[in-house]
Amino acid sequence: TGIMVALFLPLVVAQGVAALYRDQFDLSATVTPANELHLTLLYLGDTSETEYDAGQLFEWLSEWAREQQPINGKLNGVGKFNSVSPEGVPVYLSYDSPELPAFRQSLVDFFRSKGLQLEFNHGFTPHITLAYTPNYKDGWLIDVPQQEITFGEVVLAYGDAHFVASLGNQSGFFVTKDAQGNY
C-alpha cells in the first residue's frame, strides 16, 4: 500500500542478477523477486495517508520525466545497512551514476514545488535491496559483476499499480502484473 517513485531494473538484467544471489541466502531470508528489483528515488508514504491520487502524482511525474534524460551508470558491488528491520539486515546492490544525485534532487524539488511535503529520515544512498536476512555474517559477499545500466523510464508505484513515465519527450503508460507476477 506504499507509494514510491523508483527506477526498476530491466527484467532481463534483474533475472540475471537474481540468478547470482538467490541461492546465497538461507530459508529465513526475505529475498526480493527479480521483477521487484528497484532503486527507490522517493518514498511518498502510504496510499491511505495521502491526499493525492495516483492520477495526479503520475501527471506530475510525467511532466518532470519529459524534461529528463535517461540515467547511465553501473551496478557496482554489494553491501548492507547497519539498521535491522523486523525481516533482518538489508543486503543491497549499489548503483553508481555521477548523474543520479542531481537527477534525484531535481525530482525532489519538482514534487516540493507541487506542494508535497517530503520528509527524509536519512541521506540518499542509491541501492537495490536484494534481501533482508536475519543471519547476516560479516565478510559475506555476493560477487555481482559490474554491469552498465541505462534507465530510460521512471515508475510511480501506487499500491500494487505501476505507472511508467519515459525519460525524455515520450508518453508514459500504466502497467499491471501478468499471471507470473511480472510487470
Language model: regions and residue ranges:
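Histidine-dependent nucleotide/RNA phosphoesterase domain, centered on the 2H-phosphoesterase fold
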Residues: 1-183
